[in-house]
């Protein structure tokens, strides 16, 4: 797993069934002293003992944004999930997301800025791809990153570096963080 945009990243395991997802979740859960994004909390414990089922969990009220999805398959899947969860006693309420129009540009600035920092370690010395037969250290860095990253990744790294640079940090990155908080 590679960190792309730490404040936005979320591990999303793909499993055959809910029990496998619960088991994997129990391994991922909890405090890791080597992970600055983890927390130690009893609140988020997950028990698999005694074949616990979803119907026994606390009933939730789930906010569903008034957005509509572009793809019919997404809408159909969401409606099916909503029916199942309502059948288990959970409640859905329609919600408004303020400033949603600014979310894509805010995401792009934050993700690119964090990616430029997170991906800087992939220089061929300790992490990631390494070019063959570099002439010197500068050649190692340039060729490793040129050959190892695709065009879109390079574009995002450059965009993020620009957003974090002196003179543009407040104008782009801090503004994007404020927009994210408003949403």
Stretches with model-predicted labels:
Residues 1-77, 81, 139, 143:
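A short helix-breaking turn/cap at a secondary-structure junction
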Residues 36-43, 60-61, 65-67, 95-108, ...:
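Flexible, acidic loop-helix segments that line cofactor/substrate-binding pockets
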Residues 56-65, 113-182:
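Short helix-loop capping/hinge segments that flank enzyme active sites or metal/cofactor-binding pockets
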């Amino acid at each position: 797993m590679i960190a792309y945009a730490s404040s936005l990243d979320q591990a999303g395991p793909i499993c055959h069934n809910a029990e496998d997802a619960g088991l994997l979740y129990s391994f991922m859960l909890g405090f890791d002293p080597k992970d600055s994004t983890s927390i130690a909390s009893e609140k988020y414990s997950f028990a698999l003992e005694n074949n616990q089922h979803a119907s026994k969990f606390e009933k939730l009220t789930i906010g569903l944004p008034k957005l509509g999805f572009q793809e019919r398959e997404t809408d159909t899947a969401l409606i099916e999930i909503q029916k199942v969860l309502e059948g288990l006693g959970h409640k859905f309420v329609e919600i408004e997301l303020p400033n949603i129009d600014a979310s894509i540009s805010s995401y792009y600035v934050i993700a690119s800025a964090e990616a430029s920092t997170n991906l800087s370690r992939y220089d061929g010395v300790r992490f990631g791809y390494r070019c063959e037969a570099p002439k010197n250290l500068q050649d190692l860095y340039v060729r490793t990153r040129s050959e190892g990253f695709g065009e879109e990744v390079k574009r995002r790294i450059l965009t993020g570096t620009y957003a974090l640079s002196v003179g543009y940090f407040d104008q782009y990155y801090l503004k994007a963080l404020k927009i994210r908080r408003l949403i």
